[in-house]
Structure formats: C-alpha cells, structure tokens
Amino acid sequence: GENEKILNVKVEAPEEEILRYLDRKVITKDNPMTTPVLKEVVADAYDRLIAPAIEREIRSSLTEMAEDGAIRVFGKNLEQLLMQPPIAGQVVLGWDPAFRTGCKLAVVDPTGKVLDTTVIYPTAPQNRVEEAKAVLKKLIAKYHITLISLGNGTASRESEQIIVDLLREIPVKVQYIIVNEAGASVYSASKLATEEFPNFDVGQRSATSMARRLQDPLAELVKIDPKSIGVGQYQHDMNQKKLTEALGGVVEDCVNRVGVDLN
C-alpha cells in the first residue's frame, strides 16, 4: 500500500515525554541564555534525525520479523505439497485444461512412463464436446485408465463438468482429482523438461506433469523451482536470498526424509 502511495504508516511515540527526557539529559544546568537554544536544538535533533532513525529501525525490525514468519509459513506449505502421499499402481490420465488451444492429455502408466498424448477441444470456442468424449472413452478402454488428474488452471471448471458427464456414461469405475498445477508451465518450458521429453511440446509435458504429480508428488515437484510451486502470496516481497535458502532447505529435508531411489 505504501509503495502504491495509497497508505501512509507511521510509528507514533509519546513525543512530549521523550523531549522532556532528552532535555533533562542534555540541559544539566538551567541558564536563561542557553536553555532556550538547547531546547530548540534538542527538539530539532529529535524531529529531524533521531525520530526518523528510530522509526526506520523499528519498522525494519518488524518487517524482518514478518518476513521470517511468512517464510516459515511458505516452508510449511511447501512441505505439505512435497509430502503428499503418492498414489501407486494406477494408470493416470493427466489433463492440462485450456480454452483456445485445447485441453492437453497424457496417459501415464504406474511407473510414470508416458503411454499416449493427444489434444481435445471440448471447451470454448470450439465446444467439440462429443468428439472429446469419444477420444476419452477410447483412451480409457485402451489403457485401462483408473484416475484422471485435472489441473486447476484456466478452463478447469468447464473441464471438470465434462469429466463428470463422461464418468456417468462409461461402465468402468474411473475417479478424478483436481491437482494444483502451479509451476507446471515453468517446468514444461525448462531445460530439464526438454531433456526429459525432447519429442514433446510444452502442452504434452505439462499434461504429463499433471499425471505424475498424483503418482509421486515429491519426485515431480523437486524438478521445479520451489518459488514457482505456489507456496503463498507476496513471495516477491520477501528477501529473495532468505526465501530461496529456506525453501531449498525444505526440499532437502523432504528428500532426505523419503530417500532417493538410485536406480
């Protein structure tokens, strides 16, 4: 608010009490010639130099305390995201929703291997709902999909409605879960994703990430800069060095706690 020039925050202090205290400390002998001048000097020094310096120090201390508290919350949020229990033994359909460019799909087997990818256009402006349902039914039947992992971004609600309608129409039991897709776009355009899926476009990588986030959240999310995972608001207002160190420490702790498969 202050940066936008909308709010003005000040620290109010008992000025009269402070000036009386300073007068007693500075003016040791009452002299009708010097006392008035010294009082003016004390008042000017307090108003112009001492009070602003103390206010800056207090606000800096409070800001640091607030930042430390916020960073702790961000760390807890990140830990909860990383330590979500994995869902094993399921063939998952990752669904990266969108409007104009279509919804990207990726079928992933229980080991995380990508079996198939495609794009459907059930949302506006194309609204090719029946065509999309036909594609989905074929994928479910062919790969025995048991779980749909739907990203919570743009067109998520519209995609969810299509999934709900589809599940009513098919005889097999398939469930769906909405997952947080924060950081998926960052990962899908990263060098790591390009090396992992050199023949996939950004949409295919993002849909794959949606599926794998359900299967093994920790293994998938460690590929992304912790600040891009969506651990809280106003991250950019924090001390970036402290935030990076804190979130990096959380990632290390979680990986150490779970362990790493060297194979």
Predicted regions and their residues:
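Nucleic-acid-processing active sites and adjacent nucleic-acid-binding tracks
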Residues: 112-145
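Extended, highly charged clamp/arch subdomains and adjacent linkers
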Residues: 1-91, 110, 133-138, 142
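Long, highly charged, low-complexity intrinsically disordered interaction regions
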Residues: 195-263
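Gly/Thr-rich phosphate-binding beta-strand-loop-beta motif of the actin/hexokinase/Hsp70
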Residues: 86-114, 214
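Short acidic, glycine/serine/threonine-rich loops at helix termini
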Residues: 19-24, 102-110, 119-120, 159-162, ...
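A glycine-rich phosphate-binding loop feature that marks nucleotide/adenosyl-phosphate handling sites
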Residues: 95-99, 153-158, 179-186, 227-240
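Short glycine-rich phosphate-binding loop at a beta-alpha junction
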Residues: 7-10, 146-155, 177
